């Protein structure tokens, strides 16, 4: 029975500052570093040993992966970085303080942008320096693939091909796969795995730095899921 471990990155500096982060590449806070290490300790104590790991191309997820694998003494396992596991892109809200954004646009509008399934925030202009087409880590991609904003629905549409083409095949070859990624890319995956309705996924929160384990059947259907640190 293969296991899939979903690990949201530890608290980032912009999580701490209550800012919309999205694809902006901020690092972990001191608390986030501790959370990542504690996640690795929890997995080790639970006897869970990933054989291959996936992460995004953003340092808060990559560093979370490294720190947790160090505690597991498994930094040697294969590690695949895939941009499709990036956080949801918050468009023109990127970098803004969430409370100040609510004051500017109103609580209801910001709530819709953050919590509706298919309503994205205002998009970044393609010439905006925050747009991913100006970031060298995406230079090999078709610019049309790079979002200027995303809803959770659009996030799922890019995560799903990564799941089907990369992660699901890995689960058929290995007993345990670890994904260190982001709140919304992991929520998109949870929606798919658990078959949740659009409104149901909006109530799901994934905490930072707490490993969520899925035990899967041979056909990768979910048998049960649980947080290791519960």
Swiss-Prot record:
The record's Gene Ontology biological-process terms are:
gluconeogenesis; glycolytic process
| Sequence segments annotated as region (Disordered) | 117-143
Q: Name one GO molecular function term.
A: phosphoglycerate mutase activity
Amino-acid positions noted as binding substrate in the UniProt annotation, renumbered to this chain: 8-15, 21-22, 60, 87-90, 98, 114-115, 183-184
Indicate the residues that form the catalytic site: 9, 87
Q: In which pathway does it act?
A: Carbohydrate degradation; glycolysis; pyruvate from D-glyceraldehyde 3-phosphate: step 3/5
Alphabetized InterPro entries for the sequence: His_Pase_superF_clade-1, His_PPase_superfam, PG/BPGM_mutase_AS, Phosphogly_mut1
Q: Where is this site: Transition state stabilizer?
A: 182
Q: What class of enzyme is it?
A: isomerase
Keywords linked to the UniProt accession: Gluconeogenesis, Glycolysis, Isomerase
Biased composition of type Basic and acidic residues is found at 128-137
Family affiliation:
Belongs to the phosphoglycerate mutase family. BPG-dependent PGAM subfamily.
Free-text function comment from the UniProt entry = Catalyzes the interconversion of 2-phosphoglycerate and 3-phosphoglycerate.
Name it: 2,3-bisphosphoglycerate-dependent phosphoglycerate mutase
Q: Which gene name does the record give?
A: gpmA
């Amino acid at each position: 029975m293969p296991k899939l471990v979903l690990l949201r990155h530890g608290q980032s500096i912009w999580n701490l500052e209550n800012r919309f982060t999205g694809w902006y590449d901020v690092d972990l806070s001191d608390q986030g570093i501790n959370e990542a290490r504690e996640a690795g300790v929890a997995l080790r104590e639970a006897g869970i040993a990933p054989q291959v790991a996936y992460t995004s191309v953003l340092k808060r997820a990559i560093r979370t992966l490294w720190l947790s694998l160090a505690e597991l003494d498994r930094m040697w396992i294969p590690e695949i970085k895939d941009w499709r596991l990036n956080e949801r892109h918050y468009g023109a809200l990127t970098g803004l303080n969430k409370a100040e954004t609510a004051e500017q646009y109103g609580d209801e509008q910001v709530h819709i942008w953050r919590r509706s399934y298919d309503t994205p925030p205002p998009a970044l202009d393609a010439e905006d320096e925050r747009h991913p087409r100006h970031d060298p880590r995406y230079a090999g991609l078709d610019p049309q693939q790079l979002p200027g904003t995303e809803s959770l629905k659009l996030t799922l549409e890019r995560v799903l091909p990564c799941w089907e083409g990369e992660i699901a095949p890995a689960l058929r070859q290995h007993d345990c796969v670890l994904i260190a990624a982001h709140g919304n890319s992991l929520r998109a995956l949870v929606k798919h795995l658990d078959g949740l309705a659009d409104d149901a996924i909006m109530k799901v929160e994934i905490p930072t730095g707490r490993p969520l384990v899925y035990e899967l059947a041979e056909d990768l259907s979910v048998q049960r899921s649980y947080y290791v640190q519960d």
